[in-house]
Amino acid sequence: MGYKTFSKKGEETKKKVINSAIKIFKENGFNNSSVLKIADVVGLKNSTLYRYFENKKDLYNFIIRDFEEKLIKRINDNLKNYDDIEKKIEIFIREYIDFVKENKDIFDIFREAEFVNIDLSREFYDKIAKILEDILKEKISNDNVEILSYSIIGSYYFIILNYLFWEEKEIDDEKITSILKFIFNGIDKRGDFKPYLLKEKEFNGDQNKKEFSKKSERTKEIILKSSEKLFGKKGYSNTHISEIARVSKVGIGTIYKYFENKKEILKEVVRFINKSLRDYTNIYIKDYSDRRDIENAGFQAFFYLFKNFGFRYRIVRESEFIDKDTGVWYYKRLAGAYTKRLTEGIEKGIIIDINPEVLSYSLMGVGHTIGMKEFVFKKNGEIDKNSVFAVLNFIMHGLNKFLVGGKNEQY
């Protein structure tokens, strides 16, 4: 990894520094952690710690890259024993989940990487996706393997977060079987749905305006809008109450008239972002009754929203590290309604009969990882037509659409 080596005693000290840093980063987050805190836990002077790492970010990067290298080695070592593509993907997912389960604190720290070092996050997922690409390219056109690999990553992304972290439960065989059935078969039980593109629809982002009818509430609206812009641009930790007051053109005292502290502002902002997403999605899906049409339209709505209002999604992601309950509430509220609608589709014989809650988190995860890949990791903030169709075909028909000689059809 390019880091210098030390004597046996030095390596032991370095390991203590790393373990201390994991504990501090986990408890406080990157921005609220310091070299002083880390050194204090180990019982070292600051100057001694700097013999091992240049600064806090260097230490953080080391922890994440070490996690990455060990995960990739473990997956690759276990894949060597299999040739069948279905078995390889199953082993990939099982090993990924087991490794995260064994290293929960580090994985929790890693998820903050997109706010600490976006390149670190991009590199990690590119390397993980490359393993899947190597599995898929034996059977699938190179035009689609990258986007499909990210779709597979998304299929288990929120499963890990919901069950291992938010609910602290096991991801049992039934859940893994549900993930695999979705990955290979998609959601379309009838198998005859043909994805189609929808034009982008206008959305001004002010669907919540009716909630601010009184003059006092309009002041609150201004504060929330200003906070949203600042949190989205600078991040929560780098935004101060005084800046919110200045941009809102109100006094600091007025801010505290409506909110006890900055964290309360964040909670309110996340609540309105949640409603905005649902309102915007409804513009696309309101005229459909077939769940497959709704999914086809809903995913495109999410991609358009990500493209135009990606800063809002960034706020939601960051909120989980500032106030866990707020971030978890956002996703669980979406998943709860999603699960109910998917259950209705299953009962009608339209949607594949698997665990609807698992399916809801898999679908949310696909949207998340594709959104991150196309609008956060890339500089241009666009997703091409072929990629959209590949994602939609994957959602509807799974990898089998591509594995049995099928094409990424565009209708």
Identify the residue ranges that each predicted region occupies.
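C-terminal peripheral helix-coil segments that are non-catalytic and often amphipathic
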Residues: 1, 130-137, 168-225, 229, ...
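Helix-turn-helix
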Residues: 16, 20, 24-58, 62, ...
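A cross-kingdom feature marking solvent-exposed beta-strand/loop segments within repeated
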Residues: 51, 57, 77, 110-111, ...
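Alpha-helical DNA-contacting segments of helix-turn-helix folds
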Residues: 61-67, 110, 266-273
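Hydrophobic alpha-helical connector segments
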Residues: 62, 76-102, 148, 268, ...
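All-alpha amphipathic helical-bundle segments outside canonical DNA-binding/catalytic cores
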Residues: 87, 137-154, 170-177, 293, ...
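Amphipathic alpha-helical segments used for helix-helix packing
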Residues: 94-122, 161, 303-325, 370-376
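Amphipathic alpha-helical packing segments from all-alpha helical-bundle domains
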Residues: 116-140, 146-147, 324-348, 357-361, ...
